[in-house]
Every structure is written in structure tokens, then in C-alpha cells.
Amino acid sequence: MAQALEDGNPLPKASNRPAESEAPSDPQIKDNHCLGRYKVQAVRDSANLSQERIFHSALTVSGASWARRRGELRELLGLQGAAPAGWLSEEHLEPAVPGSRRSSGQGSSRVCLEPREHAWILAAAECRFEVLLEMLEAEPSLLMREDPITGYSVLHWLAKHGRHEELILLHDFARRRGLPFDVSAPGSGGLTPLHLAALQGHDMVIKVLVGALGADPSRRDHSGNRPCHYLRPDASLNLRELSGAEEWEIERDRKRENANNNSSRTTTTTTTTSRWLKRTPSASCIKSTGVHYKEASQPVKEKKASSTQEGQGRCLRRYLFPFTQNR
């Protein structure tokens, strides 16, 4: 009986472990419907967070090209099958291989230069003609390669530095190789080699460009000026005509030159006359000089007359009183 009571009402047993402080537990969601919505929201948040991390990592990849980042964006947007209109294909998205025909072609919008192109631009700016010829023998397509900053080709630099002989040699090289040779190609600001030659005052370069190489003197730069507008003021009329001056401009310059010559002659004549007048004595000066001469000559005449009279008196005394000669 006692055993049955003990089994029916068991007494709590003392525990040897210390009482643990109960930590606040998460709120228990008893509603099954709320629990389902909570799980769905948690899954969505984790998916959005992972996509956001992937998106930011795709945008901040160091050293990745724009084509690769665009491909990753396409994958995130689920556009692997078809590219939107205006996007390049996967072949065009690949970076150009150094030394390939596509990477070294003319008219490229790249800013990064190959070592050979960089060396060519430096040699052209310094007018090292022997180095330029060696590089042209190895790669003739560098002849009309322009500096991406100034827009100058080797023709611009040679014209700027007054190298007319080198211009003729380059023209002969291009003609032998059948290469394009545009002596009127515009550079930065629309300046042609003829503009630069006029700016620097290289008369022989102007004559070679127009007379021998067939440069167009009527080309205008971005300011609307022809090469003749950059000539020095004392340039000859023949040089102005070679540089693209029109007939009315040549006539105006001729009249201006004649007027300057006439004014210079008049000034020279006036200066000579004034100097001659300064050297020639005036009438008043002559009269005053004559009066002073008379005044100065009177004492001399009086001295001469007195000395003559004194001599005559001595002779008369000697004649009348000869005994006084020895005294």
C-alpha cells in the first residue's frame, strides 16, 4: 500500500547541479500559418541578400573588364539566351590580343598604346628621322599614325620643326610603298602641317608643302583661319599667295606695303632735311658772326698801322741823325 502511494505521488528529487539561469528564448510561434509565412520571408531575405552580394561583387571586381561585368549582369538578369539590342556579341566582348590586326588598326578609339606605337610617337615628336625610317621599314603602317593627345602625325612634327628635306624623303618612301600620304591632314584644332609651318615662320617648308607636295592652302582650322593668316607681318607677297591668301587680300597687302614704303621715304627725307638745316647757319647767325669778325679784326689792323708808323719813324731818325746809329 505504501509502495503504491509512493509510486502514485513521487516526491521531487533534489538535484546536485546548480540552478542554471534561464536565458530568454526566442518567441515561440504557435500558429502554423504564421510559422509558414515566417519561413517563406526568411528564405526570400536570404535569397535577396545573396543576390545583392553577388551584384555588388560583380560591380566591384578589380581589374575586370567592362565586357566581363556586363556578362555577369546578363547572367543575374537571366539573359543568357539572347542579348538585348545594341549589345555586342560575345566575340566582340573579348579583349583584343596585343599585336593583332584589330588592335593595331588605324582609327581605333583606344587610349592604351602598344610599345611600338608609343616609340613611334616619341620619335616623331623629337624628329629623330633615322629611327623613324627604321621603324617604317619594319612596319610601314605607322606612317600616318597620329598622337592621340595632340592629333599630330609625323608630318605635323616635321613641318613644325622646319624639316623640309625629311618631308620630301617621307613622300618618296610613301610613293614607293604605295602608302597613303595626306599632307593636309588636320590635327588638334584643325591645324594642318601648313598651318604649323606658317606659325613657326618656316618659309622653305611652306614652299615645299605647297609647291612640291601639293598641300591645300585653302584649308581652315577650327578658328576659321587659313595658313596665310598666321604669317608674320613682314612676309613677302609671294609667300602669302602660296599660303592661301586671296586676290583681294594680296592687293590690300600690296597697297599697305606701298603706303609703308612711301611713309618711310618721307620720314627719311624729312630727317635728312632737318639735319642739313641744323648744320647750315642762318642769316642772323652769319650777320652776327660778321659783326664779331669786324670787331675782332679792328685791333689787329690798329696794331699793324701803329707798328708801320713806328718803323717809318725809326728810319727817318736814322736818316736825319746818322751819328745815333751806334747808340
From Swiss-Prot:
Alphabetic keyword roster: ANK repeat, Repeat
Source organism, top-level taxon: Eukaryota
Region (Disordered): 1-31, 251-311
Transmembrane regions listed in the UniProt entry: none
UniProt ANK repeat ranges: 112-141, 147-162, 186-216
Positions with biased composition (Low complexity): 260-275
UniProt KW Repeat keyword: yes
A Pfam family it matches: Ank_2
SMART domains with a match to the protein in the record: ANK
UniProt xrefs under InterPro entries: Ankyrin_rpt, Ankyrin_rpt-contain_sf
SUPFAM superfamilies the record matches: Ankyrin repeat (SSF48403)
Coiled coil: none
Record field: compositional bias (Basic and acidic residues): 292-305
Family: Belongs to the SOWAH family.
This protein's name: Ankyrin repeat domain-containing protein SOWAHD
Origin species: Mus musculus (Mouse)
Gene behind the chain: Sowahd
